[in-house]
C-alpha cells in the first residue's frame, strides 16, 4: 500500500523514492510488525483470559507443565495479524509471491484456529480430527503448488537447487507440485510439534525467517545470484519484506511467550508460521536448505516418527517422551536450558545453511 503510494507520489515528491527501496521497507517491516505485536499482546492476553481460553495440558506430560494449565493460548492470532498488516503496508502487492505466502499462512491459520477452538472452548483435547486437519492442509498446499507450477512452469522457478553442487539444478516438472506439497505440509506440522515449551518454536522460526530473508534478497538480485550460482528469480526479492515482518512479529510475540510464558501461540500460530516458512523456501528454490536451517523442527518430527514406529513395531519406546524436547525435560533438564540450547542449535544451523550458498 505504502509502496504503491510512494510510486504514485515520487514523480512530484522525490522524497517518497525512499519508500520504494527494499532495504528501507525491510527495516520498516521489522519495526512495524514488532510494534504491532507489542501493542496487541496485552490486549489479546486480557481478552483471552476474559474468555477463559487457556492451554490444555496432558496429564501424562512432565509435571512442570501442570503449572501452564490455563495459560492463555491462541496468541498466534496477534502474530498473523501483525504480519498481515505489515505486509499490506510495506510490500509490493502486485507481486504474486506475497499473496501465495499470505494465502498459505492465513489458510493454515484458519485450520489451526478451528483446532484450538475445539480444544479450549469445546474442551475436546484432540481438537480438530487429524484426518480433517491434514485434508484442509493438503487442499491449501496443493492449490498453491499447482498455481505456482503454472506460474513458473519450465523455468528456473521449478528447478531443484542442490546444495554444494552449482551445476545440479534438475527441472522438476510435475514433481514440483509433489515436492511443494510435502515441504509446506511437512514444515507446518514440524513447527507445530516443536511448539511445546515457552519460546521454543518462535525463536527458531524468527531465525529461519531471517535466513530466508537473505536468500530471498540474493535470489532476487541478478548479480548476487550469478555470484552464488543460484537461480535468479526477480519476484523473490519482495519476500525479504515479508520475511522481516515474520521476524518482527515473532520477536514481539516472544516478549510475552518467553519463560514463564504469559501466552502460547497455539495451532493457529504454529501451523500458519510453518506453512509460511515452507512456502517461502519453495519460492526461493531452497527446500533442501530449509531442512538444514530448520534442523530443530526436523529433529522434533523425526523423534515422533521414531517413537511411534518403535512402539508399534517393537512395543518399546526410544525416548522417555516425544517430541524430543520432552525427553530432555524428563531427564531433568530445566525448561529454559532445553529452550536456549535448541535456539543455539538453530542459530548454528542457519549460519551453516547460509555458508553452503558459497560452498559450491
From Swiss-Prot:
Molecular function terms from GO: metal ion binding; phospho-N-acetylmuramoyl-pentapeptide-transferase activity; UDP-N-acetylmuramoyl-L-alanyl-D-glutamyl-meso-2,6-diaminopimelyl-D-alanyl-D-alanine:undecaprenyl-phosphate transferase activity
Locations listed in the record = Cell inner membrane
Its top-level enzyme class, in one word, is transferase
The cofactor named in the record is: Mg(2+)
Q: What is its EC number?
A: 2.7.8.13
Membrane topology for this entry?
Answer: Multi-pass membrane protein
Indicate the transmembrane segments per the record: 26-46, 70-90, 94-114, 132-152, 168-188, 199-219, 239-259, 263-283, 288-308, 338-358
Q: What is its main location?
A: membrane
Reaction catalysed? UDP-N-acetyl-alpha-D-muramoyl-L-alanyl-gamma-D-glutamyl-meso-2,6-diaminopimeloyl-D-alanyl-D-alanine + di-trans,octa-cis-undecaprenyl phosphate = di-trans,octa-cis-undecaprenyl diphospho-N-acetyl-alpha-D-muramoyl-L-alanyl-D-glutamyl-meso-2,6-diaminopimeloyl-D-alanyl-D-alanine + UMP
State a single Pfam family of this protein: Glycos_transf_4
Known pathway: Cell wall biogenesis; peptidoglycan biosynthesis
A Gene Ontology biological process annotation?
Answer: regulation of cell shape
What keywords are annotated for this sequence in UniProt? Cell cycle, Cell division, Cell inner membrane, Cell membrane, Cell shape, Cell wall biogenesis/degradation, Magnesium, Membrane, Metal-binding, Peptidoglycan synthesis, Transferase, Transmembrane, Transmembrane helix
Q: Does the keyword Secreted apply?
A: no
Q: What is the similarity comment for this entry?
A: Belongs to the glycosyltransferase 4 family. MraY subfamily.
Q: What does this protein do?
A: Catalyzes the initial step of the lipid cycle reactions in the biosynthesis of the cell wall peptidoglycan: transfers peptidoglycan precursor phospho-MurNAc-pentapeptide from UDP-MurNAc-pentapeptide onto the lipid carrier undecaprenyl phosphate, yielding undecaprenyl-pyrophosphoryl-MurNAc-pentapeptide, known as lipid I.
State the name under which the record lists this protein. Phospho-N-acetylmuramoyl-pentapeptide-transferase
Native species of this protein?
Photobacterium profundum (strain SS9)
Taxonomic placement: Bacteria, Pseudomonadati, Pseudomonadota, Gammaproteobacteria, Vibrionales
